[in-house]
């Protein structure tokens, strides 16, 4: 690994944003984007010139491929991303609102590859090579095993 400035981890999902305002049930066209709080931070930091690593699990599916392609395009180290043949990459649907109100978001993430993140996914020393570990409450909230991983990472950075 090159020396990383920041390591973060979490769940990435494919996000489909309705092309027109209105209820999701009536939406006929969507634009595919990437979603995930921790990944958004990683992308922003990489665009600012920081060397960023991101840890996660994605499914061996089209959405997982989309996440990996996005990481490569954004220059984010994905050497600690596990491709899981058993569980899918999550996705979400998001309404489009032109009136400034909050959009409706429907998540399809239960049983996702990222919800199976655990200490077994961690490559020893990965965060020690970074200057900063970025954690939020989102990734630890998706499963008990992901929460254990968050505490393991934080302890390693002490």
Q: For the regions a protein language model found, what residue spans apply to each?
A:
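Short phosphate-binding loop-to-helix
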Residues: 38, 85, 89-91, 115-117
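A common structural microfeature
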Residues: 51-52, 90, 104
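Ribokinase/PfkB-type carbohydrate-kinase core domain
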Residues: 1-7, 70-72, 98-158
């Amino acid at each position: 690994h090159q020396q990383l400035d920041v390591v973060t981890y979490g769940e990435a999902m494919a996000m489909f944003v309705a092309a027109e305002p209105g209820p999701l049930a009536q939406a006929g066209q969507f634009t595919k984007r990437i979603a995930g709080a921790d990944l958004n931070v990683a992308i922003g930091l990489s665009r600012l010139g920081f060397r960023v690593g991101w840890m996660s699990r994605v499914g061996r599916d089209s959405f997982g491929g989309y996440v990996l392609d996005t990481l490569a395009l954004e220059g984010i180290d994905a050497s600690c991303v596990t491709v899981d043949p058993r569980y899918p990459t999550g996705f979400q649907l998001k309404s489009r609102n032109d009136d400034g109100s909050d959009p409706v978001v429907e998540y399809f993430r239960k049983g996702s590859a990222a919800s199976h993140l655990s200490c077994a996914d961690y490559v020893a020393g990965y965060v020690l090579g970074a200057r900063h570990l970025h954690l939020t409450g989102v990734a630890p909230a998706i499963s008990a095993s992901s929460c254990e991983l968050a505490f393991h990472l934080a302890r390693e950075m002490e």
